[in-house]
UniProtKB/Swiss-Prot annotation:
Name of the gene encoding the protein in the UniProt record: cbc
Family matches, as Gene3D superfamilies: Clp1, DNA binding domain (2.60.120.1030), P-loop containing nucleotide triphosphate hydrolases (3.40.50.300), Pre-mRNA cleavage complex subunit Clp1, C-terminal domain (2.40.30.330)
Protein family per UniProt: Belongs to the Clp1 family. Clp1 subfamily.
Entry-linked PANTHER family: CLEAVAGE/POLYADENYLATION FACTOR IA SUBUNIT CLP1P, POLYRIBONUCLEOTIDE 5'-HYDROXYL-KINASE CLP1
Alphabetical GO biological process terms: mRNA 3'-end processing; tRNA splicing, via endonucleolytic cleavage and ligation
GO function terms (MF aspect): ATP binding; polynucleotide 5'-hydroxyl-kinase activity
UniProt protein name: Protein CLP1 homolog
CDD domains according to UniProt: SIMIBI
Chain positions recorded as ATP binding sites: 18, 59, 121-126
Signal sequence region: none
Alphabetical list of InterPro entries matching this protein: Clp1 (IPR028606), Clp1/Grc3 (IPR045116), Clp1_C (IPR010655), Clp1_C_sf (IPR038238), Clp1_N (IPR032324), Clp1_N_sf (IPR038239), CLP1_P (IPR032319), P-loop_NTPase (IPR027417)
Organism, as annotated: Drosophila grimshawi
GO cellular component, one term: mRNA cleavage factor complex
Length: 425
């Protein structure tokens, strides 16, 4: 049931409580102003008297350690104050990480690598945001690695990515995503190609751990790693692989005791495994909502948002000028493989893709690799384009791209199973 609060209402929050609201109406707009006291949104402090605007899809939890008064106006689907919040436990986790960072600083060692794990819809990316914000507020410069290919907090879904966090996230837009390191995966779940997923995670971990050494402040700040919500069977094996690859010092487990106990059993004794509750404000998303969220991120990549609109380009590329590949060949039994190769090597093989009508709506990744002889898996990507039309008569495709024509010389495009219906007016 929606709550029409167009005239505005003041909410008085006691210490250690939070105001939660959700917006699901398509054109709804909610304005929030901190009137007195101190409050924060996922670790970012609100500025007094400044109006913050939230739109459709927003799930907001404004927390206060000391008490505050907040003015809210607009149409919300849910709005309430809760005193049951795990924020005190989350700040205790930050304090423990800060202790690790101080030790690393004194000994000129790398700061802690921390994995945030748990099933879907328990607030993993929110906890990452809180811990990163708290870190930069005390002068740290941590790295943020996102291994969740199903949603994509840094890049679009289907990729793993890392960024350097130098300032707190914007209340309305999140972290600035400048100069990310992004590796192509091409699937919405690690199950799409488990061998490739582990290879991409290993490469990302290797490169980012080395990059810590380039700057003293970043070195001691460490890495916060967001993971997928697939935690059983092969998904659990992927978590263990990520913990090894990133040399995890701590693993924070959200809301699943079984996963917590499995990790206690399977990771080295020097890794701190901590069980944390999820926030009562976390909302479970249906498959449809998760799909909408993916689509929205892709749309924002091409078109921006209401505050910062982008104007992408559309241009034709002939089939003969398309250098299109995918990573992972169809599986073959070991007996059919060349001598010295295993079937799993085929999962990392770069194979040519023929342009057909099946390409329509697919996202293509533009790689910085110039040929298939390069390390395509371990090469950063330049960006994305979307196939909006396939013309078999003209032997051409229409591409939606943030950059004007032509494609860069020697452009190597990688196929992704991600699709985007470009119906932008």
């Amino acid at each position: 049931m929606s709550e029409d609060n167009s005239q505005g209402r003041e909410y008085t929050l006691e210490a250690d409580s939070e105001l939660r609201f959700e917006i699901e109406q398509k054109n709804a707009k909610v304005l929030v102003t901190l009137l007195t006291g101190f409050a924060e949104l996922f670790g970012t402090e609100l500025v007094k008297k400044k109006k913050y605007e939230f739109g459709v899809g927003a799930k907001v939890a404004i927390f206060t350690y000391q008490g505050c008064v907040i003015h809210v106006s607009g149409q919300m689907d849910v709005c309430y104050i809760s005193k049951e919040t795990p924020m005190v436990q989350y700040i205790n986790c930050h304090a423990a990480l800060e202790q690790f960072r101080l030790e690393a600083e004194q000994r000129d060692k790398r700061g802690p690598s921390v994995l945030i794990v748990g099933p879907m819809d328990v607030g993993k990316s929110t906890l990452c945001r809180i811990l990163l914000n708290y870190a930069v507020r005390v002068g740290r410069r941590p790295l943020y690695a996102d291994l969740d290919v199903g949603q994509g907090a840094i890049s679009v879904a289907g990729n793993v990515a890392t960024i350097l966090i130098e300032r707190p996230a914007s209340i309305e837009d999140g972290f600035a995503k400048t100069a990310p390191l992004v590796y192509h995966f091409g699937h919405k779940s690690p199950s799409g190609n488990s061998v490739l997923y582990n290879a991409v995670v290993s490469k990302m971990a290797e490169v980012t751990l080395q990059s810590l050494d380039a700057n003293k402040r970043t070195k001691s700040s460490g890495i916060i790693v967001n993971t997928c919500g697939w935690v059983k069977g092969s998904g659990y094996e992927h978590l263990l692989h990520a913990a090894r690859a990133y040399r995890a010092r701590a693993i924070f487990v959200l809301d699943q005791e079984r996963l917590y106990n499995d990790l206690l059993r399977d990771v080295p004794a020097n890794v701190h495994v901590v069980l944390l509750p999820k926030s009562g404000g976390v909302v479970e998303r249906s498959k449809g909502l998760r799909h909408e969220s993916r689509e929205q991120r892709i749309k924002e990549y091409f078109y921006g948002n209401a505050r910062t609109p982008f104007y992408p380009f559309s241009f034709e590329v002939k089939f003969q000028d398309l250098r299109l590949y995918k990573i992972g060949a169809p599986p073959l039994p070991d007996s059919c493989m060349p001598i010295g190769m295993k079937a799993e090597d085929n999962k990392k093989k770069v194979v040519a893709v023929t342009a057909t009508p099946a390409l329509l709506h697919h996202i293509l990744t533009l790689s910085f690799a110039e040929s298939t002889d390069d390390d395509v898996i371990g090469t950063n990507i330049a960006g994305f384009c979307c196939v909006t039309e396939v013309d078999m008569e003209r032997q051409s495709v229409m591409l939606l791209s943030p950059q004007p024509r032509p494609l860069p010389p020697n452009a190597l495009l990688l196929w992704s199973e991600l699709q985007f219906m470009d119906n932008h007016a």
